[in-house]
């Protein structure tokens, strides 16, 4: 029937996108809150959506952070999310629904760019490699979870995916242009990827030096002009945010203040956790197809160069994951095609076993991540049961630094009678002298306040004998206190601490 034919064509074109999008959407709905790494873009999206042109009400003017960040990514996401947010506001739903909408929009943007890359994989390597690429991506928790997190690295990832797609397509100059935009506007460290790719293209005579120079300089000037124009307005001063980030992290080497890892950490911890079964297969992919090293070597060089920086996080190299997945998909396709041969049959069985292990690791990792936002759950619980609807007075909630870093953003705030303070550097002994009704903090006891309940957070994974072999260990992370002078009009029985 015609309808069935249309549905079949739709699924053939967008089926893989629906799979990846559904997995990413589940992660967002189940764990909608955000952490300190995302705070700037999250607060910026909130302010663009709710305060619009009233810049004086924007969060970044009160809490500017260590270095300025660009508003361009927040603007793009907010423009696409605004119709949904308007409906949410009209229906009177909590603002956290708007956060979910914004994160879903970001996920759609990133997965749309991944779709472009995937289509080029299909054209260059075939349908089967494309299928394995989707399978690997869907089994990797970190990539699909991160693609909805409003981090500068993820905003840059969208442009990197477009660069990868053009690279595979043979459009080398546009590929370099996308990488330059990502470097200048979102993440200056993308230059560590731009350099190896550009050098390889020059050495293989895939591009002309002078033509590439014209492209790169023109694109860089356009990107610099755009970010300075937009961000100077938003920050109310002349600023190129990503240059200041580069100066702070690379020249002053201040990023080490947030901790350091060994030089091999990306290869012995970050990549194995993020790639799972694709990690060993990505190495095999470079051996079974002569086309793969052309794409893998620059990306591998990117990770090696990044390893020189002391401060390391998985999100810094998240843009390498799609290309490693391509190499792994090529290897998996070769193994599958030769599965009837004796040796390859054994390799195929091992690969299938690792697929199952990867799925299990993804479930465990998601469960751990679910409990990484105790402050968000604590504030939600307070809103649900902490205040009667007929009381006219304001209810002040103080959120300490730990609380603000682990789940709470302005999207988590409710309207009157709730008021919020994130005032920093208040010693615990001074809190009783302030006009705070409730406290959300990391202290189990505060003078002048009664602890109503606590929220547990992820502590560690523990191996045990028996079933299940892996146990999620949780620990009390965030406590909610109420001023002792404040009477509970409903006489609720709080669980206490």
Swiss-Prot record:
Glycans are attached at residues 253, 435. GO terms for cellular component: endoplasmic reticulum membrane. The chain crosses the membrane at residues 10-30, 71-91, 92-112, 125-145, 154-174, 178-198, 215-235, 263-285, 292-312, 316-336, 346-366. It catalyses: an alpha-D-Man-(1->2)-alpha-D-Man-(1->2)-alpha-D-Man-(1->3)-[alpha-D-Man-(1->2)-alpha-D-Man-(1->3)-alpha-D-Man-(1->6)]-beta-D-Man-(1->4)-beta-D-GlcNAc-(1->4)-alpha-D-GlcNAc-diphospho-di-trans,poly-cis-dolichol + a di-trans,poly-cis-dolichyl beta-D-mannosyl phosphate = an alpha-D-Man-(1->2)-alpha-D-Man-(1->2)-alpha-D-Man-(1->3)-[alpha-D-Man-(1->2)-alpha-D-Man-(1->3)-[alpha-D-Man-(1->6)]-alpha-D-Man-(1->6)]-beta-D-Man-(1->4)-beta-D-GlcNAc-(1->4)-alpha-D-GlcNAc-diphospho-di-trans,poly-cis-dolichol + a di-trans,poly-cis-dolichyl phosphate + H(+). Coiled coil: none annotated. It comes from the Eukaryota. Mannosyltransferase that operates in the biosynthetic pathway of dolichol-linked oligosaccharides, the glycan precursors employed in protein asparagine (N)-glycosylation. The assembly of dolichol-linked oligosaccharides begins on the cytosolic side of the endoplasmic reticulum membrane and finishes in its lumen. The sequential addition of sugars to dolichol pyrophosphate produces dolichol-linked oligosaccharides containing fourteen sugars, including two GlcNAcs, nine mannoses and three glucoses. This is Dol-P-Man:Man(7)GlcNAc(2)-PP-Dol alpha-1,6-mannosyltransferase. The gene is ALG12.
């Amino acid at each position: 029937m015609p309808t069935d034919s249309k549905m079949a064509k739709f699924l053939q074109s967008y089926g893989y996108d629906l799979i990846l999008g559904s997995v990413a959407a589940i992660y967002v709905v189940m764990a909608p809150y955000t952490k300190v790494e995302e705070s700037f873009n999250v607060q910026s999206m909130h302010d663009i959506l709710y305060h619009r042109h009233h810049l004086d009400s924007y969060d970044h003017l009160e809490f500017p952070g260590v270095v300025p960040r660009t508003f361009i990514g927040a603007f793009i996401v907010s423009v696409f999310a605004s119709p949904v947010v308007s409906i949410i506001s009209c229906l009177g739903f909590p603002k956290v629904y708007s956060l979910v909408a914004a994160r879903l929009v970001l996920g759609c943007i990133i997965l749309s760019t991944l779709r472009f890359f995937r289509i080029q994989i299909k054209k260059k390597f075939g349908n089967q490699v494309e299928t394995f690429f989707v399978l690997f991506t869907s089994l990797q928790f970190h990539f699909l979870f991160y693609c909805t997190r409003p981090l500068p690295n993820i905003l840059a990832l969208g442009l990197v995916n477009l660069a990868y797609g053009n690279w595979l397509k043979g459009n080398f100059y546009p590929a370099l242009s996308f990488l330059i935009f990502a470097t200048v506007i979102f993440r200056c460290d993308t230059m560590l990827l731009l350099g190896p790719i550009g050098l390889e293209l020059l050495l293989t005579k895939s591009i002309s030096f002078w033509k590439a120079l014209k492209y790169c300089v023109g694109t860089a000037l356009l990107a610099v002009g755009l970010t300075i124009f937009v961000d100077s307005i938003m920050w109310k001063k002349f600023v190129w945010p990503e240059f200041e980030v580069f100066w702070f992290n690379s020249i002053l080497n201040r990023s080490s203040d947030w901790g350091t890892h060994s030089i091999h950490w990306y290869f012995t911890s970050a990549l194995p956790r993020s790639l799972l079964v694709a990690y060993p297969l990505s190495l095999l992919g470079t051996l079974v197809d002569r086309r793969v090293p052309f794409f893998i070597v620059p990306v591998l060089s990117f990770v090696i160069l990044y390893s020189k920086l002391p401060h390391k996080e998985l999100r810094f190299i998240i843009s390498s994951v799609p290309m490693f997945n391509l190499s792994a998909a090529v290897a998996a396709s070769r193994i599958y095609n030769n599965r009837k041969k004796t040796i390859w049959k054994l390799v195929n069985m091992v690969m299938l076993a690792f697929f199952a292990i990867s799925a299990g690791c993804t479930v465990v990792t998601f469960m751990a991540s679910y409990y990484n936002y105790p402050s968000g759950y604590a504030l939600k619980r307070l809103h649900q049961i902490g205040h009667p609807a007929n009381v006219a007075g304001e209810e002040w909630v103080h959120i300490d630094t730990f609380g603000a870093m682990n789940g709470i953003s302005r999207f988590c705030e409710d309207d009157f009678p709730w008021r919020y303070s994130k005032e920093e550097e208040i010693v615990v002994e001074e809190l009783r002298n302030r006009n705070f009704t409730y406290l959300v903090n990391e202290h189990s006891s505060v003078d002048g306040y009664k602890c109503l309940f606590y929220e547990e957070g992820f502590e560690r994974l523990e191996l045990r004998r028996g079933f299940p072999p892996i146990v999620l260990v949780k620990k009390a992370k965030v406590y909610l206190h109420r001023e002792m002078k404040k009477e509970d009009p409903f006489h609720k029985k709080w669980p206490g601490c």
